[in-house]
Each structure stands twice: as C-alpha cells, then as structure tokens.
Amino acid sequence: MALDGENRDGGSASVRVLKHCLEDVDSISSLPDVILQENLSLIPTKFAIRTSVLSKRWRHVWSETPSLDFDDCYKLDVDFIDKTLALYRARKIMTFDLWITNGINLPYIDGWIKFAMSRNVENLFLSFDFRLYDVPDYLYINSSVKQLVLGTESSELNPRCSVSWSSLTKLSLFSDESIAKILSGCPIIESLTLHFCDQLMVLDLTKSPSLKILEIHGSIWGSGPKHIVAPHIHSLTLKTSQFFIYFCDISSLTEAKVDICFCSLKEIKANFLLDTVLKCLYKLQNVDKLTFGANFLKILSLAEGRGLPFPMFKAKALTLETTISKYVIPGILRVLQNSPELKKLTLHTMDREARTMSFHFEFVESEILTICFYINEILFCSSTG
C-alpha cells in the first residue's frame, strides 16, 4: 500500500508539473503576435520555424517575424531556404542575415537577396566564405537599406554601375575595392567600418559630411589605409598591425580608440612604430575621450623608456584596455601625467582573479592617485574576452 501511495503521490506530482508547464505555454501563447514575433526574430530562422509544432496557435507565427536569419553553420540547404521564403508572409523585412559557407549554393544567392530587397529590407547582412561570387549590380541601387554589412572578403566588390544607397546610414565592408565610388552613392552615411582593407592607400572622406563614425580593423599581416582624411568624423576606432597610418585631417574628432595588432614585441619594428605612434598621439591630443589598448600602451612604454617627448592631452575621459604589467605601466603613467584635464579613468582588464584585481587597486593607490589627484572617478571593469 505504501508503494501504491508513493505511485499516487508521484503521479499527482507529475500531473501538477505538467499542468504548470501547460499553463506557462498558454500564458506565452496569449501574448500578441507582434511580441512573439519580436522574440522569435532573436534566434536563427531554422529554430523559429520549429515553434510551429507547439500548437495551432503557433503554426504561422514565425512567418511574419521581422527578421530572417540563415546561417550556413546550421547546415541549411537550398530547399529549406526556398521553402521558408515561399511561406514567409511579412510584407516588410527589418533584418535579413545570410551567411553562406558552401559554394554549392552560389547559383541561388541572387534570388535570395532579391527576395529580401522586394520586401524593403532595412538591415542587410551578407557573408560568403568562398570565392567567385560577384556582387550583382542590382544590389548597388536600393532605397530601403539603412544598414549594410558585406562580409565578402574573397568576392568581387566592384560596381559597374552608379551606386545609389539613398537611405544607407551604416556600412561595413571587407573589401577595399571602389571605396570612393561606393561612398559617392551614400549621401547620408553616418558610420563606416572597414575590415582587412590592406590595399587601400588613401581613405578620403572629405565628401561625406554626414559620416561621423569610422572603424578600421586590420589583421596581424595587413596594415589598412596609409593616409586618412576625415575632417567630419567624431568617433574613430583604429586597430591595425604596422600602424602605417598618417592622419591628414581629423579635426572634428572627439572620441578615439586605438590599438595595434602584433603577437610579440620581438616581431615589431620598434623605431618605426615609435615614430608613427607618437605622431598619432599628437593628432589625438585634443580628443575628449581616449581609449588605448594593451599593445599601444606597450609601444608608449618603449617611448617613455627612451625619453621621447609626449604631447599634453585635453582628454576628460581615458579608458585603458589592458592587463597591468611592467610592459604597460611606464606608458600609462606618462599619459596620465600629461592629462591635466582628466576627470574619469576606466581600467578595463582581462583579469578576473582576485589577486590580480588586488594588484590593480594597489597600482591605482600607489601610482595613479599620487600623480592624478584631480581625477574624480576611477572605474574597474573585467572580462574574459
């Protein structure tokens, strides 16, 4: 009898749990479609479609989500994408994300992009991890796209027609071909990001008065543009390998984040980098908000060790993204000594161990506060990546 009682109790508990789960599902299902669709748009489309088996209520909810996300990492085939687009009901697509790694799908890509454009897509993300794809001319003429990411490092980005992206405000490219021609067709562009554009010699943004944000990300082997003329930008993010960059005009700059890519101090050409980094510093001396990365600080420490002169900075806020070590401390202290108007200092470190963080506090108390008594606020941040 005791055993029967246990079974009855266990069965009752299972029924209660099941009832509770069903109530949770019902409460979610009672939400308006627009809320459900916003949530489904946060996951890859393949997973969003699976909710159609939950109940009759969910059968078509996914088909009007504002976003479609096709990621080849999830082994999507042509039939799946074609069927998904055929069943999709929304008249407008906010975000269309297409990442294709298999060249077998090459003949179908144009059709998928045309579908997104026919629904007046606003945010278009295209990434192709193979060669031979030639970006079609029709893509260069569009009035609905506001944000465009062309992750086609190995593909051709060479428009044979005029470029007309009349609504585009944010552009990210993995190719340095035809930059001037592309920008000429972006009258209201506000943000430009360039990845691995190592062959670009001169980046002239004089004719883009609305462009306020510029990001340049190089690789360990490449360098990025050699000369930058950007009189209108307010925010600059720069991470290149050899730092072969000369700023011809960044007179409107108010915020800058800079670092260098290299694996070891032994690999760099110290004398050349010292010269170019210090020239960079002088161009940044009037910027309000500065962020320096670990490798950049290492070069500054070399400069300090050789007694080279540093400019005086007008920065009100300074962020240091580095682990505190003997390789960066001299550069940090020199920058702080030359920043009499500094009000806020942020130390963003990769270390999360209590012992290391304790060392950071000691460093601040013994070194930074001694020379920077005028700082109003010091923040510590940590992360693992």
From Swiss-Prot:
It comes from the Eukaryota. Residues 25-73 form the F-box domain. InterPro entries: F-box-like_dom_sf, F-box_AtFBL13-like, F-box_dom, F-box_plant, LRR_At1g61320_AtMIF1, LRR_dom_sf. This is Putative F-box protein At1g49610. It comes from Arabidopsis thaliana (Mouse-ear cress).
